[in-house]
Amino acid sequence: MSPAMANPRVRKFNPIAFTPLPVTFITTIVYLAVLILVLVTYLVVPPAPTLEMSPKGVNLTEAWRDLQHLTEGFHPYNSRRNDDVHAWLLHRIEAIVRESAAADGGPEVFVFDDNLSNLTYSNGGVSKSPIVGVYFESTNIIVYIRGSEDDPQNWWEWSNGKPKGKGGVLVNAHYDSVSTGYGATDDGMGVVSLLQLLRYFTTAGNKPRKGLVLLFNNGEEDYLNGARVYSQHAMSNFTHTFLNLEGAGAGGRACLFRSTDTEVTRFYKNAKHPFGSVLAGDGFKLGLIRSQTDYVVFNGVLGLRGLDVSFIAPRSRYHTDQDDARHTNVDSLWHMLSVAIGTTEGLVSYTGTDFDSKTTDQDKVNSGGGTLGVWFDIFGSAFAVFRLHTLFALSVTLLVIGPLVLFITSIALSKTDRMYLFSMSKSLGGASETVSLRGLRGLFRTPIILTVTTVISIGLAYLLEKINPYIVHSSQFAVWSMMLSVWIFVAWFLARVADFFRPSALHRAYSYTWIFIVTWIMLVISTVYANQKGIAAGYFTFFYFAAVFLATWVSYLELFSLPRKGYYARQASRRQRRRSSSLSSRLLTPSADELPSDIGPNGAENVGDPDETDPTESTSLLRGQRTTFANYRTGGDDGVTEYTAEDEHVREASIFGHEQSWSWTLPRWTWILQLLLLAPIVIILVGQVGLLLTTAMSQIGSDGVSTFIVYLACALFSTLLFAPLLPFIHRFTYHVPIFLLLIFIGTLIYNLVAFPFSPANRLKIFFIQEVNLDDGTNKVSLTGIQPYLTDTINAIPSAAGQTANCTQGPFGSLVRCSWSGLPPRVVKEDPGNDQTMGPYTWISYNITRTVGKNEARIKVSGRNTRACKLKFDNPVADYRISGSAVDHRLPHTSRQGVEEIRLWTRTWENTWVVDVDWHSNPVNPGESKDGDEKQDVSKNELSGKVICLWSDNNESGVIPALDEVRLYAPAWVAISKSADGLVEASHDFIIQ
């Protein structure tokens, strides 16, 4: 007799069986492999090609040198360095155009240095406050590359000239930076990408079919002024599609932030390394993302259709002095450039008419109308894009078909008497005898585990929010590790305990059924949002549910391999009768403890492998007391055939542990099919969305936003990521869960006690200095979160001995603290004039009131600046800027009136002439947007402030207070601007 026959409990190892070792090993490998790929996609930027492998017409070495030159200093609109950058860009553009002109086959190129356009508008479309007026003068640089199919005439030179033929393509980047950042990614990489696009499309063989407009806009950082004033240039009537290149982080991959429609998004598929998700765009729709880009002007004002591509992380370097070339790399530059080349090449080569049909809004270009889209990348190598309507239709179909298929399958199982799910027992014909099936075991196990693990994860989110709320700022992956490890350990522990006391072969089927129900509800919610609000962010729930449905269906189909319940019950009853007969014939009746464990009180089999002596050649094949129906065919009903010991051995080897004895015919390999159907797609899509969310939001705490939303996202996405493990986790060995328990303990301690900021992940604190020119006093204000703001102020020498005046900040948990600081030197005084004494002469203004009317003319000029503003204690009804254009597409004023007018000019120390009227549209007395009472505007008086701004921070000693803060602030603090100006000086005025 063979060894296997000699010992019935010896099992041949099956590497794919649903047993602990294969389940633990294969599941761990699958999860690790896909998770690592997702992480690599997010953390590793594709390498830039060598010079030899670069596309024809692209020079990355030149692009990197351009970026280094561009970021040599701060260059906000209101700085001398900004003029230098403007001149340098013109020089670089002219050099590239000359080189292309020298070569044969190059296209015509026209360069417009726009020093004529200006615009007055209200910022109601950007900010929540609708009553801030803006006057802005353009210093944009516009480059037009004529396409081979464009109108050959210079139509822009004619009075009221309009382009003929198909619309062109606009690619935009802004060359101004903030006053506290060098602008390497915001938006230096976009600017040098435009220079390389100019070189690429003027290279022989790369001539565009449709015209290409490259807009180097100036003034984006201050209310998107550069893009708005572009609307006054003739080229704004020519372009129908656009690609906006932005930077809201400081490196990594350039992300497709949002798009207007499906049709234009399809051109992004041409990108060599696509990266992004529709989730970000829906964040803007839902108001979760407050900042804006030029995208809203090109689409909302001009009616163009296009894409917004931006760097998104790390935000701790955004708008700080670490947004420089040293803290980014050529790989990130290449990623943005390759995206720009691929997308733009597709747009300028398109021959269809999708972007040239008429629109219902006559104030916008005829770019046609698109459809809402769904899009996401896969490992940064492939890109999926389709219509939201398609997703809606598929979702509705699947919501109906999924339950219907399972229902029909359940009916078929019931008809064939194999529906063990929800079956407690089986009656034997008309007799009162019943056989226990134990089919309800494991029914409520999965919802209990899901609830407990999720509640614990959310509890940890609350704990972090209370104890160390900003740890995610620098330790995002420590938080992820804590959430994931505790979820898996708790789920494993609960599943193992449940399996120990109530083992069930139906654990997988019940788990998938519950996950099916939960994901069905998720898909219903996602589908409703998609249909009613056009929100596509729940796209992953469709694929999640589809995979869960297939995996659940496999579990239901498995049940067809089981014996009929009636057949199993009859065989169990026969065995009981034979056992009773055999036992009564014995001389000694064994005690209850000696009865075989597979005989239950009602005659059903209990499973298990009780200790017994090994059979010998003289042992009966019936094995005495352990009879079985293993020899009977599952399709038989009444036939009884002699079975062999070999069948008995196969049966014993097929039943796992103490699970139901009827389960021995279940396939042992289908769990792998279910794992591969569900786990990879869930990890890829859910993991991508989870990482995108937490990466974008991990550092929102420095902006005053509660970080609980980040921890909650980690908790919920942990559940979504590892819910596919629930059908298998009870089979895991203890090694992986115990290891994860140790990781949880370590990361929990770290997350609770570690300092949340570091030199690599600094806390942003916002600076402004305000000077009262009437009495010469000044105050330095820092805005940030407590207690770290106080720690920073305590390190500043000029604040020593003073009590900082702290008030609630402009948003969320931000606090603003002020003290008397070092006086600024933004205006060079005449020798012998001590500028620390007031009054200063930095601002000149004159106010003339029209006799008999509530109208006045205010003339304002500031020294060494080109940015000022008028702030009124009560809103004025209307205003006009001398020489300004007004565009009816952009709101000029509002019914609430205008409480502030911001003035920007391309000329240094310019004089603005502003006419205001506070009579034609009076504002209700005693009302203000902040809820504070103001003076009765029915009076014929108007009071307010004349303020000028200084933003040039390139020379040490000009703003000593800022130099001091940077020098003495802790290494984990980054200084960013609090407003348009670093220094604001003001005079009070009253018009009587």
UniProtKB/Swiss-Prot annotation:
Its main location: membrane. Glycans are attached at residues 59, 115, 118, 237, 805, 846, 954. Coiled coil: none annotated. It is an enzyme of class 3 (hydrolase). It is a multi-pass membrane protein. Binds 2 Zn(2+) ions per subunit. Residues 579-620 are annotated as: Disordered. Its cofactor is Zn(2+). One of its GO terms (cellular component) is vacuolar membrane. Zn(2+) 1 binds at residues 174, 186, 246. Residues 1-24, 412-446, 496-508, 555-671, 730-736 are cytoplasmic. Keywords: Glycoprotein, Hydrolase, Membrane, Metal-binding, Metalloprotease, Protease, Transmembrane, Transmembrane helix, Vacuole, Zinc. Its EC number is 3.4.-.-. The chain crosses the membrane at residues 25-45, 391-411, 447-467, 475-495, 509-529, 534-554, 672-692, 709-729, 737-757. GO terms for biological process: proteolysis. Zn(2+) 2 binds at residues 186, 221, 319. Belongs to the peptidase M28 family. May be involved in vacuolar sorting and osmoregulation. This is Vacuolar membrane protease. It comes from Paracoccidioides brasiliensis (strain Pb18).
